[in-house]
Regions:
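Long, contiguous binding/interaction regions
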Residues: 1-89
């Protein structure tokens, strides 16, 4: 199966959604290369970047589930790098 490298940018405006967001990220953890979170306390938001190497349908599913959480928005950016699952580039 082909995989793509992608970045999901997440903004959390409702802290009560944090547990559900972390559960989703844990569910897709085998595809996650890394993540970085920045609390912006002055504005009361948290900004999270998640980098994945996964089949495109898995990336889209995760992004969609994240975007449906209350007070959470997500945007996905895909690289042009496509490889077969298990292949090292």
């Amino acid at each position: 199966m082909e995989t793509r490298v992608a970045l999901i940018g997440i903004i959390v405006e409702q802290e009560s959604s944090a547990a559900a967001l972390n559960a989703l990220l844990h569910e897709y953890g085998s595809y996650i290369i890394g993540r970085m979170g920045l609390p912006y306390r002055e504005r009361g938001v948290n900004i999270i970047s998640v980098v994945l190497d996964a089949p495109q349908d898995k990336i889209a599913a995760l992004s969609g589930k994240i975007g449906r959480l209350p007070g959470v928005s997500a945007k996905t950016q895909y690289s042009n790098v496509i490889s077969r699952e298990g292949e090292n580039q």
